[in-house]
Swiss-Prot record:
Subunit structure: The complex is composed of six subunits: RsxA, RsxB, RsxC, RsxD, RsxE and RsxG.
InterPro entries reported for this sequence: Ion_transpt_RnfA/RsxA, NqrDE/RnfAE, NqrDE/RnfAE_oxidrdctase
EC top class, as a word: translocase
Residues in the signal sequence: none
High-level lineage: Bacteria, Pseudomonadati, Pseudomonadota, Gammaproteobacteria, Enterobacterales
Function recorded in the entry: Part of a membrane-bound complex that couples electron transfer with translocation of ions across the membrane. Required to maintain the reduced state of SoxR.
Location(s), subcellular: Cell inner membrane
Protein name: Ion-translocating oxidoreductase complex subunit A
Annotated keywords: Cell inner membrane, Cell membrane, Electron transport, Membrane, Translocase, Transmembrane, Transmembrane helix, Transport
Organism: Shigella flexneri
One of the GO BP terms on file: electron transport chain
Membrane-spanning residues: 5-25, 39-59, 63-83, 102-122, 134-154, 171-191
EC number: 7.-.-.-
Topology class, membrane: Multi-pass membrane protein
Length: 193
């Protein structure tokens, strides 16, 4: 049980996909202007990452390895991600049309989010079992969502703050992201993996 807790804390805080591994920067910068949109994108990405991790592990373990088709791993995982994203898009469209309109083009872009593919590939490379794969996918998504929501809240505050003209817009957003990354580096001694 301790191993699973360490995996969760380590993935969310210490090895955060956005601030440490620099995966998923496109939605991090693009969807984080409003808190509601960032929360919606975080929830959708959490669902997709967790389900993709589970499906990718199952396909790799039950199909690719037994048939010696490991060279098709990346292609198979991209296909799994596309199917899961389409399923998520249908669910969001039916359950929350407002969120569907808010996310706009960013929902289909989860397919090309490198963090989702990165989670699937890292699960296999790290040799995780089924439960560890599911937890790793969920933890990576929670870390992604946490950082997105924090960044969106900060950006909303910066929108009304008195920022010098050269730093307005993306410049202050990048500086803020760098400061957040430095803050998350403080967690690096928390978990030794």
């Amino acid at each position: 049980m301790t191993d699973y807790l360490l995996l969760f804390v380590g993935t969310v805080l210490v090895n955060n996909f956005v601030l440490v591994k620099f995966l998923g920067l496109c939605p991090f910068m693009g969807v984080s202007k409003k808190l509601e949109t960032a929360m919606g994108m975080g929830l959708a990405t959490t669902f997709v990452m967790t389900l993709t991790s589970i499906c990718a592990w199952l396909i790799d373990t039950w199909i690719l390895i037994p048939l010696n088709l490991i060279y098709l791993r990346t292609l198979a995982f991209i296909l799994v991600i596309a199917v899961v994203v389409q399923f998520t898009e249908m669910v969001v469209r039916k359950t929350s049309p407002v969120l569907y309109r808010l996310l706009g083009i960013f929902l289909p872009l989860i397919t090309t989010n490198c963090a989702v593919l990165g989670v699937a590939l890292l699960n296999i490379n790290l040799g995780h079992n089924f439960l560890q794969s599911a937890l790793y996918g969920f933890s990576a998504a929670v870390g992604f969502s946490l950082v997105m929501v924090l960044f969106a809240a900060i950006r909303e505050r910066l929108a009304v703050a008195d920022v010098p003209a050269p730093f307005r817009g993306n410049a202050i957003a990048l500086i803020t992201a760098g400061l957040m990354s430095l803050a998350f580096m403080g967690f690096s001694g928390l978990v030794k993996l």
